[in-house]
Amino acid sequence: ADSPQLRAAKGEALVARAYAHFVLVNLFGKPYNAQTSTTDLGVPYIDFPINNFRAERPRNTVAEVYQYIEKDLTEGLPLLDDTYYKVPKMHFNKKAAYAFAARFYLYYTKWAKAEEMATEVLGDTPTNLRNWIAFQALGNNDPHAKEYTREGVEANLMLASVSSYARRFIDGQTVGRFAHSRGTAVRETFRDANNLWTNNYKDKQYESFRVDASKYIYTKYPTYTGNNTQIVLFTTDETLLVRAEARILQKNYTGAVADLNLFAKAYFMDEPQFTMSQIVSGYQNIPYSSYDPTSKLSHATQKKRLSPEFTIDNDQENLLHFLLQC
């Protein structure tokens, strides 16, 4: 039987399959590289029913996995229909699916397609970016995290439930070295002296908020008892930055700077608007992070050496450094 509802379900299934394999290939394979991905091993692409989950299957190359993902997206996106969802943001609704497609094409180095998919989500001038001012009226513990993941926030395109006992056994001190720590903030991001937006972001008072995980209940099934049970998979903010990056790599600097300024206006207190020359000269004068293998001393800055498999010029590099700070 065929019906509009079944076609919509098929569309979401295709997009979900594409997303699952996208996550897996970037976890177990190398990043996409036009020069090497035809031989780099990726993951098996399961596009057929399986009965034996333990059977060994040959790994597709990274290039093959990306081709299959694109095929699923091309077939699945036109079939989506949000009218069948009771809770759209827990599904691959249209905007979430196009946001994923934008991210995928950015990884796939198909910049024009990434820009096209992002614009499907945002329109030419998005008005649904995250309202960071709303965080100022909240407490600095659970309410802050819950507001970020709240279904009603227009900037949140898709949510997912998660369940993990890791936080019960690994405290913040243990994993702090891998997190956005105070040292990172001082030398590389928010509080760095070279920061173009001068430590002036709208949710600044919550830069050191914490979550009290001292009391918890073990449940048989995932339940929404705290702020660690729901995550945001796609947002308008990230999709805007995907489009900005795609425009930078196409040398559409006017469009890229416009997108970066939309993000800056939403996030920073004085709502700054930068020119391209300000961004390029600002990052041009920042030294690269460095490490001396003899003394084993490191000097961390906002600026890391970028090593893409494609060529970028000076203007593109410095615009990308700005984007990476957003």
Regions from the language model: what does each represent?
Residues A1-D82, K86:
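Aromatic-anchored glycine-rich loop motif in surface-exposed flexible loops
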Residues S3, K10, R17, V87-M90, ...:
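Residues that mark the junctions of alpha-helical repeat units in TPR/alpha-solenoid scaffolds
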Residues V23, L27-K30, Y107, V242, ...:
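Alpha-helix C-terminal capping/termination sites
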Residues K113-D237, L260-N261, Y267-F310, E317-N318, ...:
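Hydrophobic-face positions in mid-chain alpha helices that act as interaction patches
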